[in-house]
């Protein structure tokens, strides 16, 4: 009877130890999972940056198949100030947030407007661009100059963008959704669309660079604050990126990069 009792007690002690060890292992796993991206970047010396890679002048491939653009210059400068290198990963727009949440990259620096809906899924840094949407038509069009004018018109916008929201705010607008900006610019020039809505910086750059037979016809419809998106729970990383961005603005580096790509001073909030 005593042997049975001793054996039972030993079994209970062993079980308790196993549970304790299992608990510690789980705690370590949970702790590792909560490690801020800033630590991973510091260890690897690489900051993985995602964007579409097809959105000039923000992010696009040049003739040498190298990424360049405003977002690229901003990313490289932030990475330098964090003591790491930027690695660029081109991802389709509708896969950016999903890829971020799957840890395929560390940060999205790709003209993502800060919205309440997106803030449910990701955290944003301070805005690194303030811009706005505009109406764009063919050169001969003169009857679409304000948002109300798109009623009854075929309107091209990027699916899942704030431009889609702007277009859908007008009852009676025939809104067509696209995946690539180049596709709806082409449809506009080929008269399959009456008007498109997109970012004023992007459109002014592309009209000038590519000598497109289209024009911006409206004032800025709404101002958008563009932030860099990171996974939730990475407060240290967000703080470091914000600090680097502030330094860039204070020492004139940000303004220099902005003027390089857009030829004007940055738009205020």
Annotate the PLM regions.
Residues 80, 85-149, 215:
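Acidic, polar ligand-binding/catalytic clefts
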Residues 88-98, 142, 160-162, 176-190, ...:
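Short helix-initiation/N-cap motifs at beta->coil->alpha
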Residues 17-20:
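C-terminal motif of bacterial Sec signal peptides marking the signal peptidase cleavage site
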Residues 22, 72-81, 159-161, 227-265:
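Extended ligand-binding regions for polar small-molecule ligands
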Residues 45-51, 147-160:
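Short loop->beta-strand "edge-of-pocket" segments that line small-molecule binding or catalytic clefts
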Residues 30-111, 251:
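Extracytoplasmic small-molecule ligand-binding "clamshell" domains
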Residues 84-85, 101-110, 153-154, 189-202, ...:
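Alpha-to-beta junction loops
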Residues 53, 130-137, 200, 204-242, ...:
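Periplasmic-binding protein-like
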